[in-house]
């Protein structure tokens, strides 16, 4: 039984305490991955491990096993919009992460949502899409480049994937550097680019955060002689949580 002599806690004090103790919210747009390697599964795990709370918007689902992707089933863009806006109207969002969302229509829907939250950093991940139909790839990349890159704070992707996408006519004797790729991304409005998996001598790879003007940070890793999936989604989700 409550003590009748106790005074009620001031509502404003409760709200202040909640805001100070509640984890930051990261909205992530991504596909379900039944294998558990990437997609929303990776996002939710990585965001939680970095101390933030996921607002997970399902954009579709991969049809895959642990070895390869066979297909992708995209949701209707209205279903994606309804999920996102319902959560956004209820909870404050501190960062937005965009993974593979499956169709130009969903890219457009997310771009429209993001434009209403222009002050929130948007971290975009571009995975390897070589498993997909060539025409579908072209349409998706065109929509992403035109609609989402102008709103992107940090673009994340593997060196070869970003090279093929942003510098398709590269004619240099050497492969493009992280700064070269950052310059290409900057032409569409992206201030920061995190390029992963840059080949180095002696079985090492380099991950580099760059702007067109400078390399801001780099970290060298030993290359594993193994096939794995989900690293890009995990990295991008963790970065989103740290920026939230």
Predicted regions: what is each one?
Residues 30-35, 216-230:
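Short pre-catalytic strand/loop immediately N-terminal to key active-site residues, enriched for Gly-Thr
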Residues 31, 35-38, 65-79, 134-139, ...:
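Active-site-adjacent loop and "lid" segments of alpha/beta metabolic enzymes
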Residues 4-28, 44-131:
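Conserved N-terminal subdomain of the carbohydrate kinase-like
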Residues 51-55, 215-217, 242-244:
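Phosphate-handling active-site elements
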Residues 32, 98-99, 196, 228:
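Glycine- and other small-residue-rich loops at beta-strand/loop junctions that grip anionic moieties
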Residues 46, 164, 226-244:
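Short, small-residue alpha-helix embedded
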Residues 136-216:
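Conserved phosphate/ATP/ADP-binding segment of small-molecule kinases
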């Amino acid at each position: 039984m409550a003590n009748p002599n106790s005074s009620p806690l001031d509502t404003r004090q409760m709200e202040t305490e909640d805001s100070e103790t509640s984890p930051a919210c990261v909205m992530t747009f991504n596909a379900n991955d039944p294998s558990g390697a990437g997609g929303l599964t990776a996002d939710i795990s990585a965001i939680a491990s970095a101390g933030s709370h996921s607002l997970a918007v399902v954009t579709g689902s991969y049809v895959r096993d642990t070895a390869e992707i066979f297909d992708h089933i995209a949701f209707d863009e209205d279903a994606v919009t309804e999920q996102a806006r319902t959560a956004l109207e209820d909870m404050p969002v501190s960062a937005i992460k965009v993974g593979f969302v499956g169709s130009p229509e969903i890219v457009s829907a997310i771009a429209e949502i993001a434009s209403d939250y222009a002050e929130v950093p948007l971290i975009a991940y571009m995975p390897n899409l070589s498993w997909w139909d060539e025409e579908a790839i072209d349409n998706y990349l065109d929509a992403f480049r035109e609609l989402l890159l102008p709103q992107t704070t940090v673009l994340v992707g593997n060196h070869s994937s970003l090279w093929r996408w942003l510098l398709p006519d590269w004619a240099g004797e050497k492969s493009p550097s992280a700064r070269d790729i950052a310059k290409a991304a900057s032409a569409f409005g992206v201030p920061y680019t995190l390029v992963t998996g840059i080949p180095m001598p002696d079985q090492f790879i380099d991950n580099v955060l760059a702007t067109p003007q400078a390399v801001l940070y780099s970290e060298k890793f030993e290359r594993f002689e193994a096939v794995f999936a989900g690293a890009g989604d995990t990295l991008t989700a963790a970065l989103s949580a740290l920026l939230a």
